[in-house]
Design a protein with these regions (language model features):
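Mature, function-bearing regions of proteins
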Residues: 1-254
Length: 254
């Protein structure tokens, strides 16, 4: 039985201040059990692992970004921060490459023990400058709704200051997925962002069906980021220059 899955759903962003701004887009995501990548490569037509296809997943799009083992990268960082790294299962929720192109503003790693209890969450955040920051959380209680919070440590939007806090909420993947991020400054909520989806089996039929619903999803995501940024600028929202250049940072959060 394959544990990996496909989720079709939507992304919502709502900005509350200094001016209200809202958008919603339909997307599909893959939830990949990293131990199944070679099986998926062999069994699912039009999907490939670390090589070109209509739909593909490359390890170099995540982790160290050098094509090295993503499983090893996860385990190395769990060990570094004293989180269980042996006898675990790793799943990643992300957008796939479509015709070789992808941009993942957020990828989520779900780390389970062998009893299928969630023990850690990694939020891998990217910006359009090719930079990446991963927030690692230890999960102390296996519940369906996981909640995490931390200070913002990475420049994402040029229209939001760095002096902010994130409040993450997510459901353990099942028939549905849900990832919600609320962003606050010292006074009020600035942003609500969410991604949800409904599960389908990871097979050729459902993969092609998802692709046909979203044939240019990668390009739509990239264009949407810039189009929505233009609309924010046109509304007169202050442009905040990026001050610090990083490549690939990782922090452990409480």
């Amino acid at each position: 039985m394959i544990n990996s899955a496909i989720y079709n759903g939507k992304v919502i962003h709502k900005r509350f201040k200094p001016k209200v701004h809202y958008f919603k887009y339909k997307v599909f995501s893959l939830l990949i059990d990293l131990s199944e990548l070679e099986i998926l490569d062999k069994k699912v037509n039009f999907f490939s692992y670390n090589k070109f296809n209509l739909i593909s997943f490359y390890e170099k799009d995540h982790g160290d970004r050098d094509g090295s083992s993503l499983t090893s990268w996860v385990k190395k960082n769990l060990e570094k921060y004293n989180i269980q790294a042996k006898d675990i299962k790793i799943k990643i929720l992300c957008y796939p490459r479509i015709f070789g192109f992808v941009f993942n503003p957020l990828s989520v790693f779900y780390i389970y023990n062998l009893e299928d209890q969630l023990i850690s969450i990694l939020y891998e955040v990217k910006n359009t400058f090719g930079e990446q920051h991963t927030y690692i959380f230890k999960v102390t209680k296996d519940v369906n709704l996981v909640q995490n919070n931390c200070s913002k440590k990475f420049h994402v939007s040029p229209f939001i200051e760095m002096n902010c806090n994130y409040f993450f909420r997510l459901l353990k993947p099942g028939n549905k997925i849900s990832v919600i991020i609320d962003q606050y400054d010292n006074e009020d909520q600035i942003l609500y962002a969410s991604q949800d989806g409904t599960r389908s089996d990871f097979n050729t039929q459902h993969l092609i069906k998802s692709y046909l619903k979203h044939p240019i999803m990668t390009f739509k995501i990239i264009l949407a980021i810039h189009f929505e940024a233009f609309k924010l600028w046109a509304k007169g929202i202050k442009f905040i220059k990026k001050k610090i250049k990083i490549k690939n940072n990782i922090t452990i959060e409480n």
